Amino acid sequence: MKIPEAVNHINVQNNIDLVDGKINPNKDTKALQKNISCVTNSSSSGISEKHLDHCADTVKSFLRKSIAAQSYSKMFSQGTSFKSLNLSIEAPSGARSSFRSLEHLDKVSRHYLSEIIQKTHPLSSDERHLLSIIINSDFNFRHQSNANLSNNTLNIKSFDKIKSENIQTYKNTFSEDIEEIANHDFVFFGVEISNHQETLPLNKTHHTVDFGANAYIIDHDSPYGYMTLTDHFDNAIPPVFYHEHQSFFLDNFKEVVDEVSRYVHGNQGKTDVPIFNTKDMRLGIGLHLIDFIRKSKDQRFREFCYNKNIDPVSLDRIINFVFQLEYHIPRMLSTDNFKKIRLRDISLEDAIKASNYEEINNKVTDKKMAHQALAYSLGNAKSDMALYLLSKFNFTKQDIAEMEKMNNNMYCELYDVEYLLSEDSANYKVLEYFISNGLVDVNKRFQKANSGDTMLDNAMKSKDSKTIDFLLKNGAVSGKRFGR
């Protein structure tokens, strides 16, 4: 895909490299083997510690690149949106993904960069100045969660990685995301302009959503990351009244507050979401912002954007008002260079959903709170938390009866415990614990949801053979046996 000559006329302080760098997996493998060989018999070769560190870094770099290739191969070969846009690649024939998927990322990035260059060339002096500020800005990347993801090291895993390790946690990745863009092997971050003295983070929501009470902030990008101007799946910018900093814009501007709500997309319609690799992302952001400013009828907003002395916080307000930047790192982030900032308290239910043991232990200090926690665990199908609480507290049948009577817990108000133990998302081991320890009656008829049914009826509806067999061995019968 040819990049138009117009790119050569963008005069910015940074040298924007748009050259198509080819990746040769065989060459990289040979280079790796050469570096690995240097550590063989190191005890007798007298190799310096610095040289060994270099070899270790080479291995880490190669592994990181290989993992990234797998994540992008999955995204570009499985996502139906890429297929409909003719931006897909073939799935790898073998077990391993080649580096072609990384080459493809660069090609896709150049494609979207070429589109916006053609649309915005030539630039005025004000536009070139704004673009140079953005290109030379440092970014902070913010991941929010109710989970405790760090001790001395921050470890954030993709949904696909979490699932492969059988870790149970509340997810923000839905079936539509997986089907259409298949980016469930990436870790997601909001993006902020740094170089300011304000309290971090500048933003606490993304696309109007509060993703958690803990903000984990890093100030370094990934050589294999990619950026979208919006949420990758939902590329509609919300109206100003849903914006976190709405008062800033409502108090200062008029026309632009009605212009901001829109789909951000490429030339092939609203499902065509621009993607930029790490190298191209600042240029992509800057040119798309200039395109929006040109279309705006709000003269005061335009003047504000082109202010020669615009400060980093104001620039961030603009960018995360016009867009909702989202950065993606393949599979997993592990770093000791981060900041953890507590934004608010975490509710007990949110701590349960996030499997935040530290927070749960701080909140659940007596049997009464344990009743609440167990109800939240069953209601959210959090078997790991349910089994943890059952092992920590000596629950009796009377405790379960008292738990069911709680009027300040939605799950106890709407469902019988027996229903929660046997519905389609329930866990067999939790059900087994309750019945084996005599905490519930196997044939108690539901009094709330699905009134008159029993646990066997629930299991039959979900066609869970393992649960059905266990219930039958313990004398379970259908509620129909009792009549209605």
Swiss-Prot record:
The record marks H143, F188, F211, D231 as: Important for catalytic activity. Its main location: secreted. ADP-riboxanase effector that mediates arginine ADP-riboxanation of host caspases. ADP-riboxanation of host apoptotic caspases (CASP3 and CASP9) prevents their activation, thereby inhibiting host cell extrinsic and intrinsic apoptosis. Does not catalyze ADP-riboxanation of host CASP4/CASP11 or CASP8. In contrast to Ospc1 and OspC3, not able to inactivate host calmodulin. Keywords: ANK repeat, Lyase, NAD, Plasmid, Repeat, Secreted, Toxin, Virulence. NAD(+) binds at H143, Q144, S145, L149, I162, N172, F188, H206, F211, D231, E326. It comes from Shigella flexneri. The keyword Transferase does not apply. This is Arginine ADP-riboxanase OspC2. The keyword Lyase applies. Its EC number is 4.3.99.-. The gene is ospC2. It is found in: Secreted. GO terms for molecular function: ADP-riboxanase activity; toxin activity. ANK repeats lie at residues 414-444, 451-480. It catalyses: L-arginyl-[protein] + NAD(+) = ADP-riboxanated L-argininyl-[protein] + nicotinamide + NH4(+) + H(+).
